[in-house]
Amino acid sequence: MKKYVIVTGGVLSGIGKGIFSASLARLMKEHGVDVNVLKIDPYLNVDAGTMNPNQHGEVFVTEDGYEADLDLGHYERFLGRDMTRQNNMTAGQVYLRVIEKERQGKYLGNTVQIVPHLTEEIKDRIRALEAELLVVEIGGTVGDIEGEVFLEAVRELQMEEGKENFLFAHVTYVPYLRTTNEFKTKPTQQSVQLLRRIGITPDMVIVRSEFPLDVPSMNKVALFSGVPRDFVINLPDTKNVYEVPEILRDMGLHEKIASKLNVELKKSTFNWSYPKAFKPYRIALVGKYLGTDDAYKSIIESVFLTGIEKPTVVDSQMLEDMNDEEVKKVLDEYDALIIPGGFGRRGVEGKIKAIKYARENKKPILGICLGMQLMVIEFARNVFGYKEANSTEFDPNTPYPVVDLMEEQKRILKLGGTMRLGAQKVKIFPKTKLYEVYGGVEEVYERHRHRYEANEEAFPELFKKPGEEGYKLVVSAKSDFIEAVELEDHPFFVGVQFHPEYKSKVGAPHPIFVYLRKVLEGSQ
């Protein structure tokens, strides 16, 4: 019989339900349990593809081309396995499917309602995921109007599948009031009471806090939540999220869950390896989304997993207003640059200035997706003298469209879910840095998310094959179009059309980030 851990949130959003869910799943996997994870997002978007990264964080792309919430990135990195579109459910998907069924006459003339039609659709999708143990994370907080139908659905599911097969874990937050030097548990108490009114009684309360809670506060949470004291778990802030699985292991979380759900655990050596000492290199992530690190989460974590301190986001718009000397003064403080993907013209000219600086000053630089396209634009402008060179994304009338909309994209009018997405085959050419990155492998699959491509057909003079003469961009990888470019006689000037950051895992960061570290160490 399938077992379920339902993770809900209270008091605040963004307090770590995703990290807790991923850590719990990894812990159970280490003890031989066949585990899977489902993230439920109560928003009405069909997927995360058109959402603003400043508001929602990065869009994570799966192997099968699904544009997902960033929590799926946590699941992949922690579990060391790929997620698919089945690992994410949104309210938009559920409503859309129910309306489609109604139009098809699937409800036989019944009045279509939240209960039972939406709740049945939700339960069917939850049941469809195969696993011995399914961890279901419900986004948002208890009390959000968008999430009520999902809480009702899991309440019904518990009744249908048996209470003995369910564990409800409520992740909440206890603030520390500095004016009185005490923790305040009242918001957590009220959050649990609200969950109970919906018909769900938590079996476990995970208390997030800035500092470790004192014993009286923990006892108070247990008393007013009606949860046994040993099922109230405090998770204070940590230096990095990769400590959390070890913390939960030391608390015996896996044993508590196995006991409650009657799951058999196998002995484990807990093979969990992440960097604990860091090289003192400074990497500038030249981007425009400054509100939160979540906008570039997978890049930041990929760098961190190589044993380098997390990159600093440098405002590309700030660089736009600077001359070359001012740009140099800012970027000289860093050992390497990363130009990430993105959309729209805001901040683009600042990124191009950063690329010019890196090219002229032999500073290691990695361009990702848009970053690679901007490398082509910078080279066309400043080496070939095509001063008006641009992408048709930013200037549809440019006389030098060195980056252009892919041919198959020109017939597409909708934005959502229509880009070139997911894992695509990439051919790597020998005698290039990228060939060294992959250890001599000539064919790989990498994840993509783009509509535009380097316009090699119209501007072949910008590019050359490995080993050819002339100061041009070396095409180091191709599919039906250019997948990567680099420069000879430069420590590391590499641009890739794909997103390597999506494939990094704990203990196995993507090789391009590992190679960048080796360049900084002087070993390449």
Curated annotation (Swiss-Prot):
Activity control mechanisms: Allosterically activated by GTP, when glutamine is the substrate; GTP has no effect on the reaction when ammonia is the substrate. The allosteric effector GTP functions by stabilizing the protein conformation that binds the tetrahedral intermediate(s) formed during glutamine hydrolysis. Inhibited by the product CTP, via allosteric rather than competitive inhibition.
Any GO CC annotation of this UniProt entry: cytosol
UniProt keyword Cytoplasm, yes or no: no
Keyword ATP-binding among UniProt keywords: yes
GO molecular function: ATP binding; CTP synthase activity; glutaminase activity; identical protein binding; metal ion binding
Catalytic activity as recorded in UniProt: UTP + L-glutamine + ATP + H2O = CTP + L-glutamate + ADP + phosphate + 2 H(+); L-glutamine + H2O = L-glutamate + NH4(+); UTP + NH4(+) + ATP = CTP + ADP + phosphate + 2 H(+)
CDD domains: CTPS_N (cd03113), GATase1_CTP_Synthase (cd01746)
UniProt KW keywords: ATP-binding, Glutamine amidotransferase, Ligase, Magnesium, Metal-binding, Nucleotide-binding, Pyrimidine biosynthesis
Pathway in which this enzyme or protein is active: Pyrimidine metabolism; CTP biosynthesis via de novo pathway; CTP from UDP: step 2/2
Residues engaged in binding ATP: G14, I15, G16, K17, G18, I19, D71
Binding site for UTP: S13, K184, T185, K186, P187, T188, Q189, K220
Residues that bind Mg(2+): D71, E137
UniProt-listed InterPro entries: Class_I_gatase-like, CTP_synthase, CTP_synthase_N, GATASE, GATase1_CTP_Synthase, P-loop_NTPase
Residues reported to bind L-glutamine: G342, L370, G371, M372, Q373, E393, R451
UniProt: CTP binding residues: S13, D144, I145, E146, K184, T185, K186, P187, T188, Q189, K220
Protein family (similarity comment): Belongs to the CTP synthase family.
Additional remarks: CTPSs have evolved a hybrid strategy for distinguishing between UTP and CTP. The overlapping regions of the product feedback inhibitory and substrate sites recognize a common feature in both compounds, the triphosphate moiety. To differentiate isosteric substrate and product pyrimidine rings, an additional pocket far from the expected kinase/ligase catalytic site, specifically recognizes the cytosine and ribose portions of the product inhibitor.
Subunit structure: Homotetramer.
PANTHER family, sorted: CTP SYNTHASE, CTP SYNTHASE-RELATED
Official protein name in the record: CTP synthase
Source taxonomy: Bacteria, Thermotogati, Thermotogota, Thermotogae, Thermotogales
